[in-house]
Design a protein with these regions (language model features):
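Generic beta-strand structural signal
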Residues: 65, 104-106
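C-terminal beta-strand-rich structural cap/linker in extracellular carbohydrate-active enzymes
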Residues: 108-127
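A short, polar/proline- and glycine-enriched secondary-structure boundary/capping micro-motif
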Residues: 23-26, 83-84, 107-109
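Carbohydrate-binding surface patches
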Residues: 1-15, 19-21, 54-91
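Hydrophobic, well-ordered secondary-structure elements that form the walls
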Residues: 72, 96, 118
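Solvent-exposed beta-hairpin/edge-strand motifs
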Residues: 87-102
Length: 127
């Protein structure tokens, strides 16, 4: 659940015994939890995350951002290919450069052609 105290401090609470319960080993490794954590992060920070690609729990995303651009690295740590990954950015961008992949930019959305098993892709989007 999400909670904001009288001082305006925000908390996101995941009620599970992660330390002592083997059933919680994959608690965060599923589609629904990924969407929930993404939404909680947006609420906690008061702004969108720089890049989000839900529906792929074994996809790791790293970002670097400044006032005019965002650089994104996607690493697929699973044995299955990710077909047509769709990455939602925190704002609209007008130009993009791809590294190790092909795709297209549509405002705040980047559509890649595919991401190979254990593969990576990267791009830099600019205002």
């Amino acid at each position: 659940y999400k909670y904001q105290n009288a001082d305006g401090k925000k908390f996101a609470v995941f009620a599970a015994d992660f330390q002592n319960s083997p059933s919680c080993a994959n608690y965060f490794n599923n589609y629904y939890r990924q969407a929930q954590v993404t939404e909680c992060a947006k609420w906690l920070c008061g702004r969108k995350l720089p890049a989000v690609c839900t529906g792929n729990p074994n996809l790791y995303i790293m970002t670097a951002k400044d006032e005019k651009s965002v650089s994104v690295l996607l690493v697929n740590i699973f044995m299955d290919e990710i077909y047509k990954p769709e990455i939602t950015l925190d704002r609209k961008y007008s130009r993009i450069k791809f590294v190790g992949c092909n795709g297209e930019l549509n405002g705040d959305t980047v559509n890649l052609t595919k991401l190979a098993p254990y593969g990576f892709a990267a791009f830099e989007a600019e205002i």
